[in-house]
């Protein structure tokens, strides 16, 4: 009976309790607000701050009621001090030098000010500051301030706004846009009562060159847990000075110079000292962590995108460089984190540093690409911080956002998250994406997918959740996710998928109770979530109120750890902006929901409420849940992190409430506690690979020879091997008994070799399973990115010069071609076999996919617009079921959105050119010139349009029949058929006027069957006309035009070419006027066909082709022996080089545009050029004047660091060794870079030859090419410092100016030039602005060499310039259009100055006519030429009147009254004349004297004329033996130089200038002998050593009839 009554009573009590729990609702209090605000709760209290507009409010009851803080009404933003979250807060005032501070949870506030004299530079200044507290001494404050100077006309408010924006923007980018702003750091030791500026000065250069400076400081003690033994007063700082020019976002290379220093103070900033180990390094960033100090240095002072090094100090005193698996260039400074054992996680930015800024006027270029977004890689270090590795599964080349998240109470647990957009187009992001998420519970050693364990909802998923490898949860993003202060209870938004596709619409809310290992569905929509009572109370608010099919807003709450949910309807419709727990430690029961009021307009659309009450604050209180019952031990369960496995040598146990317990923990303000159970025995998880080892694909630690080399371990090796432990214990792991790690024997044969002391050269090796078809670098300074395509039609990308190589994801589509944009060097296009077009605008960092028109790919090269990045032309075959189909024809398609869409532009178009974008002065900037193929007869015609061929009215036929056309420099050259199997060339500079290329008269009998355009770098066209086309006997005439391409002169008559039209012709890059050619000596034998072996000889010119000579040979060979032909003269003993026609890769030029004066070539010394395998390798460092032999045998070469590093590999043979030189070729060192010999194929580096990394490509010899091995050889550590580049202080830098002209004081292009060259060999050049390294020492006086025939004029036989028949002179008024400041022009004389000439004064042939006023500039013309009345009177009228009066007086008194002029011839000196006074006598004496002088001069001239005439006649008769009339011819060498400065010696008819020289007073006649002044070479070279030289490749574009 008693038992039954007890049971009944108990059941009633339980029933009532359950009923009460079911009826529970939280206490919700709503307050309204008129503006935007943010909420900041103090820890362990009910006090909350609200920053609303400019006011600060406070609540003492978890947000139920609010009151304004009196006296504070100018707040810009506020924050709780993270080091003292229970008491301290700051509020930044709109008045920049004022900050409000509280140390008692807002009860009282003090005003902190920085005295203006501390930060003002004498001008008006405003500043905005952020205060940082000392971790252990709250009275110590650092103020990081951004100071902006302004003048009286500027408003303080705008200045403050700029300073404030700098706090939230990257400061460097901000200050680049506004150099009037700077940052400063101040310190206070008395809680902000006064501040002192930290003064750290760097005086490396003149302050006038200082662009701006930055200062960043941090307390040495990072937190109360810091292991730093420095004193509390220690502060680290880095000061950076930027000199030079302001950053320009349109250019990737910044013309700035960085000077920085890393210092510390141990007395609150009174004195500073440099950290000696980092002295001389460019410190870019630093951060003090609890267990280590991290410093990042920049390698190149002239390139803010240069490689960086990471330095780690565990004792905060000595530093060790950390090994990075890739070049470190872009990082997210400030987001580097440290875990409990000292591992560092480092996100690396892959941003687009080349993006256009808003000032770019080209709308096409301003379209935003996805590549402007951040794409990151994640690196993680070992526990010692000295070796970083990639998280391999996160590597991808799609548009990817990567993130690693860890949480304080989940020891050893990491979440990895990526969002990829593989099909993202240029028009904006797509909602289609690939999500991938993984979890690791062992510090990242192993990773697994996020399992879905949710059998009751299994049917709601699109994949089989029982197979987590292909169906798992992928988190949308963990940015903004709360720091789960719970024992393993978590909620996220994500989508369940196979990892290949996801959509925002599929995103739902999921919950986990085991630390993120397994998950189940919570809501079928996205929510914002918050936790209370350490996870026992959960609140979730839908982002979209209609997501639950209910238009009214609501929140959901769970009191059983997410097992069940209860809905709470809100009275107002809101957009949730903020949901937080009022207790930051997660222990409380009250939440704040901040939402914007919204009005429904039907459906799922919402708009802002127009009323002022737009903001609501909801206080949600769960204090009464479960009738305030607190949990007891029986309500708890034990839960272990990572399933109870040892993490860092310990197990971590939480005593958490069971999900079904009807109670709350109610330990308000108690931090979440766990029990640490030390593991007895250590396991593999307590060890990591030793420094010299890395994990292979199976997880085994294997030796890495690069790391082995860096460690120096092999210094102790015996017999070439060393015994090492492959694993080491993780720092700070807590396990007690160590594992036994067996030593392994590691070979050291390739480490610490004599040729690689101190491990200064590092090598990385990668293998491909097939041969490489093509490989090419992007030509940028941002990084060393290149694309490689294999024989299997797969594309790979590397961003660090081949050290790390990743496959480009094309969804298994084969790639048939890679095309680079020649005008935008970071752009490339991959053409897929199935019509896919993969586009990168950021050097292969990311690719987007587009679709080509549904046509057959013809393989015709794309045509790009020179100024519009997204505009190009693609050629596709239409109606091409078969390439042999009669209907198959080409169509030119155009895109203006970067390949996103294409439109048909021109039917039968096979070759187009955006000519209007390439001409210097186009007649229409929108002009396109296209070649059309008539499939019916195979003929081609040339047409142009100015509106993409949209209308016939703007389409013009230029030539009815052409063979082809090409562009070179500023010219466009068209080849037309002429007669039988001949052609003619026409050139244009503007796309409208075409002029026929007039060849020298002696070529009139030669058929023009084939010519090759060789380039126009010097303003004239170099052209090769084939004069012999016998098989294996091809050669021809080398010609050069004037600057408008209308007339040519001959340079050399038998220059070698091959059957493909390539010519042995190479201009030396970077130097003016130096060209190398090979000529055929046995032309008669070759033309007759009696031999197929051409005897080639090499020649060089130093004046752009005017004079040629054989190349001087070295005195001795590389073995110190004399050549057998020595002493026989240059004709029998000169240097001969293998040229352009024999190259496997036309990019392998003799020279480099950045290594001035250096050339390397393969050749021989003798009478003729020998086969390559009988040759040696030579180099020169003075532009080709003198040469040295480097080694016997042929080698391939490459230049690095602008010639500071030279590398050679054997050409075409097996080897494992390279040669390198760092002293301009004076000494060479052998270095073994491979473990075994491989077939050498190529050596390459960046196009600018500025890097210190080289890529060597080797290949096996199987049928399909077998495997390919690429070696990335890094010389970056070979130099101890960067060269000092300071042209203003020549005595203190590492450069000097040198001349490469072998004839001193000789002028070319009107000047004498010098080039900058590095002096010392212990430094590297890097990105120093060597474009300024060319200087003109002297501008020469103008001579005939500096003029050429004007547009539509040609050089006649008499040497003068005459108008081409049928053409008219160019409109002289064009100068008025091209130069808005011009007010006058001259009529054309037929001559104009050569564009490259800088001559001054001297001969003037182009402006001898009288000036005429420009249209609309008559008044300005008159103003500059007229003389005013007074000046005219003084200068002309008055003197004229005086002279007239004197003349009349003399005539009247001395001539008229003595008989007049009729007696003039009769008067004798003694005759009587009228003399009445002294005046008459004086006048008569003047008349007598004038008469005597006139008579004497006239008589003398007659006698001399008669004598000279007779003498000359007699001499002529004696010499010629005949009599006849004689003619006087004006002759001078100066005038006989060619119309394009090359006539002398090339046109024997151009020697009569009589018709031209109608007024010889117009010219200076130079009578000096012009001789062969450009042939300075001696028969024997001197004994002194010489080094290398480099040059430019020619266009070598051929047109044949």
From Swiss-Prot:
Residues spanning the membrane: 1431-1451
Skewed-composition ranges (Basic and acidic residues): 352-369, 1577-1587
Glycosylation site residues: 121, 156, 457, 505, 1044, 1289, 1339
Record topological domains on the Lumenal side: 21-1430
Membrane topology annotation: Single-pass type I membrane protein
Biased composition (Polar residues): 1591-1601
One Gene Ontology cellular component annotation held by this UniProt entry: cytosol
Record keyword Nucleotide-binding present: no
Top-level lineage group: Eukaryota
Cytoplasmic topology ranges: 1452-1601
Signal sequence, start to end: 1-20
Region (Disordered) location: 349-369, 1558-1601
Keyword Membrane assigned: yes
Keywords, in A-Z order: Glycoprotein, Golgi apparatus, Membrane, Protein transport, Receptor, Repeat, Signal, Transmembrane, Transmembrane helix, Transport
Location of the protein in the cell: Golgi apparatus, trans-Golgi network membrane; Prevacuolar compartment membrane
UniProt BNR repeat ranges: 58-67, 100-110, 439-448, 510-520, 556-566, 796-806, 838-849, 893-903, 1178-1188, 1220-1228
GO term, biological process aspect, one: protein targeting to vacuole
Pfam families named in the record: Sortilin-Vps10, Sortilin_C
Function as written in the Swiss-Prot or TrEMBL entry: Functions as a sorting receptor in the Golgi compartment required for the intracellular sorting and delivery of soluble vacuolar proteins, like carboxypeptidase Y (CPY) and proteinase A. Executes multiple rounds of sorting by cycling between the late Golgi and a prevacuolar endosome-like compartment.
Family classification: Belongs to the VPS10-related sortilin family.
The protein, known as: Vacuolar protein sorting/targeting protein 10
Phylogenetic classification of the source organism: Eukaryota, Fungi, Dikarya, Ascomycota, Saccharomycotina
Gene assigned in the entry: VPS10
């Amino acid at each position: 009976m008693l038992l039954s009554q007890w049971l009944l009573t108990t059941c009633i009590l339980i029933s009532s309790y359950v009923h009460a729990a079911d009826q529970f609702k939280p206490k919700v209090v709503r307050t309204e607000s008129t503006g935007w605000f943010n909420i900041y709760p103090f820890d362990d209290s009910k006090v909350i701050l609200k920053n609303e507009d400019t006011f600060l409010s406070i609540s003492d009851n978890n947000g139920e009621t609010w009151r304004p803080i009196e006296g504070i009404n100018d707040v810009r933003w506020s924050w709780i001090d993270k080091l003292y979250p229970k008491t301290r807060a700051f509020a930044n005032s709109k008045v920049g030098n004022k900050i409000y501070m509280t140390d008692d949870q807002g009860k009282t506030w003090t005003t902190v000010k920085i005295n203006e004299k501390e930060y003002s530079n004498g001008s008006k200044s405003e500043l905005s500051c952020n205060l940082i507290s000392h971790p252990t001494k709250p009275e110590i404050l650092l103020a990081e301030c951004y100071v902006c100077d302004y003048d009286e006309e500027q408003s303080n408010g705008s200045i403050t706004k700029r300073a404030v924006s700098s706090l939230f923007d990257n400061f460097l980018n901000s200050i680049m846009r506004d150099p009037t702003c700077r940052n400063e750091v101040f310190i206070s030791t008395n809680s902000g009562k006064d501040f002192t500026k930290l003064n750290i000065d760097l005086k490396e250069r003149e302050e006038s060159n200082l662009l701006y400076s930055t200062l960043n400081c941090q307390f040495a003690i990072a937190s109360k847990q810091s292991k730093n033994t420095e004193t509390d007063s220690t502060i680290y700082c880095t000061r950076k000075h930027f000199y030079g020019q302001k950053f320009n976002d349109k250019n990737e290379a910044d013309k700035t110079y960085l000077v920085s220093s890393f210092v510390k103070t141990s007395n609150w900033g009174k004195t500073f000292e440099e950290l000696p180990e980092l002295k001389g390094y460019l410190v870019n960033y630093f951060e003090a962590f609890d267990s280590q100090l991290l410093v990042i240095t920049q390698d190149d002072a002239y390139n803010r995108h240069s490689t960086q090094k990471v330095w780690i100090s565990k004792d905060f005193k000595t530093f060790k460089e950390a090994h990075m698996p890739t070049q470190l260039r872009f990082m997210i400074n400030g987001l580097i984190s440290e875990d409990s054992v000292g591992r560092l996680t480092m996100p690396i930015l892959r941003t687009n540093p080349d993006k256009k800024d808003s000032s770019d006027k080209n709308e096409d270029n301003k379209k935003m690409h996805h590549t402007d977004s951040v794409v990151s890689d994640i690196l993680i270090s070992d526990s010692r911080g000295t070796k970083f590795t990639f998280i391999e599964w996160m590597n991808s080349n799609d548009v990817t956002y990567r993130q690693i998240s860890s949480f304080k109470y989940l020891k050893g647990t990491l979440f990895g998250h990526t969002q990829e957009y593989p099909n993202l187009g240029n028009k904006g992001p797509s909602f289609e994406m690939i999500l991938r998420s993984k979890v690791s519970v062992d510090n990242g050693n192993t990773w697994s997918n996020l399992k879905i364990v949710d059998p009751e909802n299994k049917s709601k998923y699109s994949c089989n959740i029982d197979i987590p490898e292909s169906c798992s949860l992928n988190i949308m993003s963990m940015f903004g996710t709360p720091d789960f202060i719970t024992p393993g209870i978590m909620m996220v938004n994500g989508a369940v998928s196979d990892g290949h596709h996801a959509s925002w619409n599929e995103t739902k809310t999921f919950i986990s109770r085991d630390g993120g290992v397994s998950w189940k569905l919570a809501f079928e929509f996205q929510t914002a979530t918050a936790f209370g009572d350490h996870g026992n109370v959960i609140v979730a608010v839908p982002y979209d109120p209609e997501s639950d099919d209910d238009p009214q807003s609501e929140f959901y709450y769970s009191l059983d750890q997410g097992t069940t949910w209860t809905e709470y309807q809100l009275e107002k419709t809101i957009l949730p902006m903020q949901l937080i727990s009022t207790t930051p430690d997660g222990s409380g029961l009250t939440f704040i929901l901040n939402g914007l009021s919204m009005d429904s307009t039907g459906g799922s659309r919402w708009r802002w409420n127009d009323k002022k009450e737009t903001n609501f604050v909801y206080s949600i209180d769960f204090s009464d849940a479960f009738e305030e019952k607190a949990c007891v031990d029986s309500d708890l369960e034990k839960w272990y992190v990572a399933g109870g496995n040892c993490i860092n040598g310990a197990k971590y146990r939480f005593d958490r409430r069971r999900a079904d317990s009807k109670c709350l923990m109610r330990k308000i303000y108690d931090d979440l506690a766990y029990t640490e159970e030390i593991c007895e025995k250590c396991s593999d998880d307590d060890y990591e690979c030793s420094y010299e080892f890395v994990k292979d694909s199976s997880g085994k630690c294997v030796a890495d020879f690069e790391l082995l080399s860096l460690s120096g371990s092999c210094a102790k090796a015996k017999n070439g091997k060393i015994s090492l432990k492959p694993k080491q214990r993780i720092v700070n792991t807590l396990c007690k008994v160590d594992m036994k790690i067996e030593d392994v024997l590691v070979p050291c044969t390739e480490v610490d070799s004599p040729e690689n002391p101190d491990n200064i050269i590092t090598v990385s090796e990668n293998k491909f399973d097939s041969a490489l078809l093509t490989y090419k670098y992007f030509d940028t300074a941002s990084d060393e990115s290149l694309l490689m395509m294999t024989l299997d039609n797969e594309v790979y990308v590397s961003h660090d010069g081949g050290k790390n190589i990743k496959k480009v994801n094309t969804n298994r589509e084969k790639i048939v071609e890679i095309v680079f944009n020649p005008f935008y060097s970071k752009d490339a296009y991959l053409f897929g076999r199935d019509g896919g077009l993969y586009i990168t605008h950021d050097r292969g960092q990311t690719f987007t996919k587009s679709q080509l028109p549904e046509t057959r790919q013809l393989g015709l090269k794309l045509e790009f617009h020179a100024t519009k990045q997204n505009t190009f032309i693609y050629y596709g075959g239409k109606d091409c079921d078969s390439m042999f189909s009669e209907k198959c024809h080409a169509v030119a398609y155009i895109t203006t959105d970067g390949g996103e869409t294409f439109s048909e532009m021109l039917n039968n178009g096979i070759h187009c050119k955006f000519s209007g974008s390439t001409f210097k002065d186009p007649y229409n900037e929108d002009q396109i010139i296209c070649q059309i193929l008539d499939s019916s007869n195979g003929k081609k015609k040339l047409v142009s349009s100015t509106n993409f061929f949209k209308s016939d009215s703007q389409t013009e036929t230029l030539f009815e029949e052409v063979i082809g056309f090409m562009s070179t420099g500023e010219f466009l050259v068209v080849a037309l058929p002429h007669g039988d199997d001949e052609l003619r060339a026409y050139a244009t500079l503007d796309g409208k006027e075409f002029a026929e290329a007039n060849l020298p008269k002696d070529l009139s009998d030669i058929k023009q069957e084939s010519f090759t355009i060789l380039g126009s770098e010097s303003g004239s066209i170099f052209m090769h006309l084939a004069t012999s086309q016998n098989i294996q006997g091809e050669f021809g005439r080398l010609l050069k035009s004037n600057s408008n391409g209308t007339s040519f002169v001959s340079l050399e008559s038998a220059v070698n070419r091959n059957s493909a039209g390539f010519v042995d012709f190479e201009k030396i890059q970077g130097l003016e006027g130096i060209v190398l050619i090979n000529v055929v000596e046995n032309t008669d034998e070759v033309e007759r066909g009696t031999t197929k072996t051409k005897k080639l000889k090499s020649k060089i010119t130093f004046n752009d082709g005017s004079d040629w000579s054989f190349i001087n040979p070295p005195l001795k060979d590389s073995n110190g022996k004399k050549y057998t032909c020595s002493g026989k003269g240059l004709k029998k003993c000169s240097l001969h080089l293998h040229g352009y026609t024999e190259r496997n890769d036309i990019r392998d030029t003799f020279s480099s545009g950045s290594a001035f004066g250096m050339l390397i070539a393969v050749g021989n010394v003798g009478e003729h050029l020998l086969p390559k395998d009988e040759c040696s390798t030579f180099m020169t460092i003075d532009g080709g004047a003198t040469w040295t032999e480097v080694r016997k045998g042929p080698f391939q070469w490459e230049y690095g660091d602008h010639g500071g590093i030279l590398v050679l590999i054997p050409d075409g043979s097996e080897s494992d060794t390279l040669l390198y030189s760092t002293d301009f070729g004076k000494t060479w060192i052998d270095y073994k870079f491979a473990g075994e010999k491989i077939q050498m194929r190529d050596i390459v580096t960046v196009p600018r030859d500025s890097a210190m990394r080289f890529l060597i490509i080797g290949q096996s010899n199987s049928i399909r090419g077998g495997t390919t091995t690429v070696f990335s050889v890094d010389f970056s550590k070979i130099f101890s410092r960067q060269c000092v580049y300071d042209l203003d202080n020549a005595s203190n830098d590492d450069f000097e100016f040198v001349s490469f002209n072998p004839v001193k004081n000789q002028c070319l292009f009107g000047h004498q030039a010098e080039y900058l060259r590095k002096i010392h060999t212990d430094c590297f050049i890097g990105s120093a602005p060597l474009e300024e390294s060319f200087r003109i020492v002297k501008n020469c006086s103008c001579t005939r060499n500096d003029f050429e025939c004007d547009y539509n004029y040609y050089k006649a036989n008499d040497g003068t310039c005459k108008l081409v028949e049928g053409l008219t002179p160019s409109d002289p008024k064009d100068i008025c259009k091209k130069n808005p400041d011009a007010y006058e022009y001259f009529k054309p004389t037929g001559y104009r100055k050569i564009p490259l000439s800088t001559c001054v004064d001297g001969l003037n042939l182009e402006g001898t006519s009288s000036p005429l006023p420009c249209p609309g500039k008559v008044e300005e013309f008159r103003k500059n030429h007229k003389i005013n009345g007074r000046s005219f009177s003084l200068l002309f009228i008055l003197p004229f009147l005086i002279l007239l009066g004197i003349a009349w007086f003399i005539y009247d008194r001395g001539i008229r009254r003595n008989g007049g002029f009729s007696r003039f011839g009769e008067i004798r000196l003694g005759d009587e004349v009228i003399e009445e006074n002294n005046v008459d006598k004086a006048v008569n004496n003047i008349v007598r004297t004038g008469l005597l002088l006139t008579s004497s001069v006239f008589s003398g001239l007659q006698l001399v004329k008669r004598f000279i005439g007779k003498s000359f006649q007699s001499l002529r008769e004696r010499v010629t033996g005949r009599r006849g009339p004689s003619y006087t011819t004006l002759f001078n060498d100066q005038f006989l130089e060619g119309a394009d400065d090359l006539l002398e010696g090339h046109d024997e008819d151009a020697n009569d200038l009589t018709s031209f020289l109608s007024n010889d007073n117009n010219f200076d006649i130079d009578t000096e002998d012009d001789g062969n002044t450009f042939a300075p070479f001696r028969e024997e070279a001197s004994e002194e050593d010489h080094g290398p030289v480099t040059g430019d490749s020619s266009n070598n574009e051929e047109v044949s009839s």
